A protein has these predicted regions:
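N-terminal beta1-alpha1-beta2 module of alpha/beta enzyme domains
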Residues: 1-82
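Acidic (Asp/Glu)-rich catalytic clusters
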Residues: 11, 45, 72-80, 103, ...
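Active-site mouth loops of central-metabolism enzymes
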Residues: 20-35, 89-96, 167-175, 276-284
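A conserved active-site cap/scaffold subdomain adjacent to cofactor or substrate pockets
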Residues: 179-197
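Flexible, glycine-rich active-site loops centered on histidine and acidic residues
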Residues: 13-30, 92-156
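An alpha-helical appendage that flanks or caps ligand/catalytic pockets
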Residues: 4-6, 130, 136-161, 201-301, ...
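Hydrophobic faces of well-ordered beta-strands that scaffold small-molecule active sites
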Residues: 16-20, 52-54, 84-86, 114-118, ...
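Conserved, mostly hydrophobic/aromatic
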Residues: 16, 44, 48, 56, ...
Length: 341
């Protein structure tokens, strides 16, 4: 595993990182959510988290970040040591050359700190996915492996008509299926599995490790930590309501806890129920640490990316703080970034 020195690892050698979807709390604006992202990134940097990845979603009332590449620059500028990247860029929407140019620029500005996580999912509904296409008369072509190969070539050597080599970010393949594991293994790429989407992915990670000579595995989980198990479960009501609504075809801002509890009660949803096909780790610091270690062991992962969605930003900060303290991670010295003239 690449050692970027951003945190001291736990006894089980698990690196901790952040996955941020820039959730929009009810009563706040998308701009507020994006400013929360920068604030949380600075806090995560001070706590010693290894990476800060920004997710891509389109047409969602609950998630503010449609362009991770736009947020990576401000986040990297506002932090000192933490690696910053996309979690991920949904490559089928874009030109590989444009993605290479964008992330090559970011890597030049913040050398040694930029990650390019690549995904294949639409990140939105079919209707919005169509709106993202430049030529809407044609059905999108599913040529993801070819796109990924072209993208990597831009970081390898100069090509005809492109007289320079882009500065290279660290490229990761993201996924939640067996196919993504196959591609990651074939291409020899680091692989991050979205357990928060598909908690049955241990076999995919096992395949990847068994077929990739230099495997590097991370797992992204949903987690909420508080001082007590009961308080963490209470805070999780917001994301559980949002998921119930999402599964019904409605994207809503993250509701306040009291509103979410009332909704779940009216709908007859048990207090601890998570929608089928999802897993949310909740609990006190000790409980969450045990769950994280168990999931990391399931996946054979040396790194865990933590996604925390709650209504109150202070509670979200506190969740990451409690987890960092429980694992005993500490910030390292700053990595040089954009020089000031």
């Amino acid at each position: 595993m690449h050692l970027y020195g951003c945190i001291q690892q736990s006894a089980l050698s698990i690196s901790l990182s952040v996955l941020d979807q820039s959730p929009i709390p009810s009563g706040f604006s998308p701009g507020d959510a994006l400013r929360n992202t920068i604030d949380l990134a600075q806090f995560a940097d001070s706590l010693g988290y290894r990476r800060y990845w920004l997710a891509e979603h389109h047409g969602a009332a609950s998630l503010a970040c449609a362009s991770p590449e736009v947020m990576i620059g401000p986040v990297a500028a506002a932090t000192k040591s933490i690696r910053v990247g996309s979690g991920g860029i949904m490559l089928p929407h874009y030109s590989p050359l444009k993605v290479a140019e964008t992330f090559g620029m970011l890597a030049a500005l913040y050398p040694g700190r930029i990650d390019l996580g690549i995904g294949r999912a639409a990140g939105t509904s079919p209707r919005v996915a169509q709106a993202l296409q430049r030529d809407r008369r044609l059905a999108p072509v599913d040529d993801f492996p070819a796109q990924l190969g072209e993208l990597r070539e831009y970081f390898a050597d100069a090509r005809p008509g492109i007289p320079f080599r882009f500065d290279a970010p660290a490229v990761w393949l993201l996924g939640s299926s067996e196919q993504s594991a196959i591609w990651a293994a074939e291409l020899g790429l680091p692989y991050a599995f979205a357990d928060f989407i598909n908690p049955e992915g241990a076999s995919c990670a096992e395949y990847y490790r068994g077929h990739c000579a230099k495997s590097e595995t991370a797992v992204a989980i949903s987690a909420i930590c508080a001082e007590t198990d009961d308080e963490a479960m209470r805070l999780s009501a917001s994301v559980r309501m949002a998921l119930v609504q999402l599964f019904r075809g409605r994207s809503v801002p993250v509701p306040p806890v009291d509103e979410a509890l009332a909704f779940l009660s009216r709908e007859g949803v048990p207090a601890s129920l998570v929608p089928v096909g999802r897993r949310i780790v909740t609990g006190s610091p000790v409980s969450v640490r045990r769950s994280i270690e168990k999931i990391a062991d399931e996946y054979g992962a040396g790194e865990v990316l933590i996604l925390t969605v709650v209504h109150d930003h202070a509670a979200r900060r506190r969740s990451y703080e409690l987890i960092a303290r429980e694992f005993g991670i500490k910030a390292a010295s700053a990595t040089p970034g954009l020089p000031l003239q």
